[in-house]
Amino acid sequence: MTSLRMAVRAHPTIAYLVLLFGGAWVLFLPALLGQSGIGLLAVDIPREPGLLLAVLAIMGGGSILVTWIADGGAAAKAFARRAIALRAGPQWYLLAIFGVPLLVLVAAVILRGPDALAPVAQNLAELPGGYLLPLIIAAVLINICEEMAWLSFLTDRWQERIGPLRASLAVAPLFGLLHIPLFFIVGGLADGRLPLSAFPEYAVLLLVVATVPVRILLTWVWNSTHKSLPLAAIFHQSIDMTAGAFMLATFYPGINGLWVYAALAVAALVVAVATRGRLGLPSRAGAAGAALAGAPVVVKV
């Protein structure tokens, strides 16, 4: 056994984080150096190829590879099968698709009164093509592999050791930090080029304000749905789209994207308190029973 393989087996999450940040940031580099980025290269290099490759190869493929090295082929196959695990009740799919838009609508009514309902009624026909279809496409192409890294690999390992709430809090700044290079790329974090003066605000937003409630809620959905990656991916993309320009302008005019994350923060606090920090994770006795039934419980970090 090589020393590298031994190191990965001893510390799989550290090994994966090195692969994740090193690989993803290298793939972000061409667009970052091009005219849509900081402009060191004379050509405009689109960001999409690097982003898609980072998601598919590093976040998805890399997490499977490290699982295979650390835990063996059977564990890697079980890990990969989570990408097609659909065994959750219909109420969870309704929550994943419509929960965040409805939460923001409630917040809009509280802020603006009953008039906030009018844009929704007037533009309801825009929902299938402007929200539902791109939601499913993006969840399948991007968010399943993305959450294979954050939920299925990192959170799932850490929550067995330090608990789901602490695991979510640990993953949150890492999730935000990975996105930092996108700040300097046109269209990376916003539709246009962000001024450097906005960097401190976006850094706080990425590292704390947006990511902490999002990771808490995603962990809750993950644990409550028998670790269904497709469902978690849909919920993740629903958050991104609801806070995006189309949904805000069409259904919530006058509501700033920060209010979306404020509403999510309230929801995350309610979930954390209601579940006593377990976020849907079975008790240790229940987890032991699952292990006896043949479900692997991985605790290596």
What are these regions (language model features)?
Residues 106, 154, 214-218:
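Hydrophobic/aromatic residues in alpha-helical transmembrane segments
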